[in-house]
Amino acid sequence: IEKMSEHHLKSGGKRLRALLTLESAKLTGYKDEIRDINLAACVELIHSATLLHDDVIDESSLRRGVKTTNSIWGNQSSILVGDYLLSRCFEIMVQDGDLEILQLLSSTSSKIAQGEVLQLQHKGEADLLEETYIDIINLKTAALFSAATKTGACISGSNDKEKKALESYGRNLGLAF
């Protein structure tokens, strides 16, 4: 598991979602630099797990110019490593103890899975409705961007108005991404 996880995590990427968590926490006054790093790692673990699963679903052999985990070790191992990364994320969140963040990131993980299923249901549709397309990217992409920014606000103990503003910013950024 360690070798496969390391291969995937070292295969590149911008770590944008984790950065959004860190910067949102900083923007809203967080200074401790421990919880934000741990919870930004959770956001990145969720994203990495979804990429591992997505590569299996899409039968991808390359991601960012590097062989995918599933192309090296097989689909079954890749799915299990994705599940492992999600489990590690939940362990970190439970240790953190913030139920609002646990609820936010667990529901976001569910939304991402729903978005993937919705995309599969409409695969190959040339006449895909714009509304359906927006629903898919809202669930698959924007949900995690939104959760990343809101998590940063939660870490710093922001008020509801600040949380909603950062959540909205993340969602809009994710839709544009």
Predicted ranges, named:
Residues 2-177:
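Mg2+-dependent prenyl diphosphate-binding active-site environment of isoprenoid biosynthetic enzymes
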